[in-house]
């Protein structure tokens, strides 16, 4: 049994390159216009071990690692009204995904 706070990660929004850049894409995407690994509304539980949830995108996990560790070890985000959660995103500049990461009550 771990000692960290459990978290929930919710996939809030997926964007395409066109959503961000319009018709002036900096590169030509080779893959689908939206992330095909995650679905809007999908939820993942980060257990008290801190391991990446099964089925979660490794790229996004790397991007959320600081937020996850901060919340799991008791940190808060004072600049939010809800200091026990934060909006975060992956750094795929062509097909980004927005997340809500929140502490679960014990």
Model-found features: residue ranges?
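Residues that cap or initiate secondary-structure elements
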Residues: 15-17, 50-52, 105
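A general secondary-structure signal for short beta-strands and their flanking turns/coil
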Residues: 2-6, 94-96
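A structural detector for beta-sheet-dominated domains
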Residues: 10-12, 47, 102-104
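Short, compact, well-ordered microdomains
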Residues: 60-106
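Short, flexible N-terminal segments of the mature chain
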Residues: 22-50
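A broad, low-specificity signal marking well-ordered, structured residues that form hydrophobic/aromatic
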Residues: 7, 44, 99
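Short, Lys/Arg- and Gly-enriched loop/turn segments at beta-strand edges
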Residues: 51-62
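Short, basic/aromatic beta-hairpin or loop at an interaction surface
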Residues: 8-24
């Amino acid at each position: 049994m771990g000692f960290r706070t459990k978290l929930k990660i919710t996939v809030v929004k997926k964007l395409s390159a066109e959503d961000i850049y319009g018709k002036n894409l900096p590169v030509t995407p080779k893959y689908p216009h939206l992330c095909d690994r995650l679905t809007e509304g999908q939820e993942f539980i980060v257990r008290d071990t801190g391991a990446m949830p099964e089925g979660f995108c490794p790229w996004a996990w790397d991007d959320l690692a600081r937020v996850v560790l901060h919340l799991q070890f008791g940190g808060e985000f004072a600049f939010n009204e809800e200091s026990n959660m934060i909006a975060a995103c992956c750094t795929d500049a062509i097909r980004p995904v927005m997340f809500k990461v929140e502490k679960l009550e014990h």
